[in-house]
Regions:
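Transmembrane helix-bundle core of multi-pass membrane transporters
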Residues: 101-165, 267-272, 291, 299-306
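Hydrophobic core segments of alpha-helical transmembrane domains in multi-pass membrane transport
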Residues: 22-23, 47-51, 101-105, 149-161, ...
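Hydrophobic alpha-helical transmembrane segments
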Residues: 9-12, 41, 61-69, 91, ...
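Alpha-helical transmembrane segments within multi-pass membrane transporters and channels
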Residues: 58-103, 154, 252, 256
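Membrane-interfacial amphipathic/re-entrant helices at transmembrane-helix boundaries
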Residues: 1-22, 35, 49, 57-62
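Helix-loop-helix "hairpin" substructures at the membrane interface of multi-pass membrane proteins
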Residues: 141-219, 247
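Transmembrane alpha-helical segments in multi-pass inner-membrane proteins
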Residues: 204, 215-277
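Cytosolic-side transmembrane-helix boundaries in multi-pass membrane proteins
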Residues: 177-191, 262-306
């Protein structure tokens, strides 16, 4: 296989990592009946606090922990608004996005004295797995890659196992389809929703951390650049199933990687920049008829007596 094709595929996987993390986050939240429209903002918060953590401690892994904790906190805010106070899910998510865009700029200026970008910090670097790197083609694509790729693969398996092989997963699936029925079965619907949305926030924030300490080792204003919204479309493309949702990120990753390699070709740059979004929309048009969202996603649940 030619070097250009291998480079294209390697770029596809790297670009897909943050999208897939965020898409898994959106899938888990919706499975519990809560639409996480705040993925964009939570990713931005995660990317910022990953840099802050790395800057303060000197360790990129501590930065990743900072990002995960910030995501859990933002997930708690979102689920409190949507489940606790019964706010509209979309409005609550948009509010999270606006808040994240503003607070990161304020904190950026407080810590680094600039509104544009932070200083360089320690990054996660690349992980080379000798066994995988020796496999033809596959080794060229994922033999040397961010350790977050392997964390992503682990998360896909764990979410699949949780949802389809455990009693807790069955409860989550029932809540997403019919929370009233889950309540009559003795399931603590609110507790499960809180846990799922907080875990969703953690996953989205880790995806955001990849953009900073997993790639350029710094934070830049609004660096998520719409990836949270793209991730929501990947949830639909993957039909709310962990493996297919994660693989859906490869669609955008391929288009984005192809865009990078078409720069300099005799094509209007505006058309090249539109390519990832056009391809995503086209794929969604074909996939939407086969997708089936959880029936109770975005709907408020009321316990008896409320």
């Amino acid at each position: 296989m030619s070097g250009q094709i291998l480079s294209l595929l390697a770029g596809m996987v790297r670009v897909a990592i943050p999208i897939s993390f965020a898409a898994l986050a959106g899938m888990l939240s919706e499975r519990a009946g809560v639409i996480n429209m705040g993925l964009e903002g939570i990713m931005l918060i995660g990317s910022f606090f990953a840099v802050v953590g790395s800057y303060v401690t000197g360790s990129a892994w501590m930065g990743l922990l900072f990002a995960a904790l910030s995501g859990i906190l933002m997930g708690l805010v979102l689920v409190t608004l949507t489940v606790g106070f019964k706010c509209e899910h979309v409005l609550a998510g948009v509010g999270i996005n606006i808040f994240a865009s503003g607070i990161t700029i304020v904190l950026l200026e407080m810590i680094w004295g600039t509104k544009g970008k932070s200083g360089m910090v320690a990054g996660l670097g690349m992980l080379r797995v000798p066994v995988i790197s020796k496999i033809p083609v596959i080794g060229d694509i994922i033999g040397t890659i961010s350790p977050l790729f392997y964390i992503l693969v682990l998360c896909v398996f764990l979410l699949w196992f949780l949802l389809y092989r455990t009693p807790a997963g069955l409860r989550i699936l029932v809540i997403g389809e019919n929370p009233e029925m889950a309540g009559t079965m003795g399931v603590n619907v609110y507790k499960m929703q809180y846990l799922c949305v907080m875990a969703s926030g953690m996953l989205a924030a880790i995806g955001g951390a990849y953009l900073s300490i997993g790639d350029i080792n710094m934070f830049s204003k609004d660096m998520v650049s719409g990836r949270g919204y793209i991730a929501l479309s990947m949830v639909i493309l993957g039909n709310w199933k962990p493996l297919w949702v994660a693989l859906g990120g490869l669609v955008y990753g391929f288009a984005q990687s192809l865009q990078f390699r078409l720069q300099g070709v005799n094509i209007p740059p505006q058309m090249v920049q539109m390519l990832p979004y056009i391809l995503t929309l086209v794929v969604l048009l074909f996939a939407r008829k086969k997708s089936s969202a959880p029936a109770a996603s975005g709907k408020h649940y009321y316990q008896k007596g409320e």
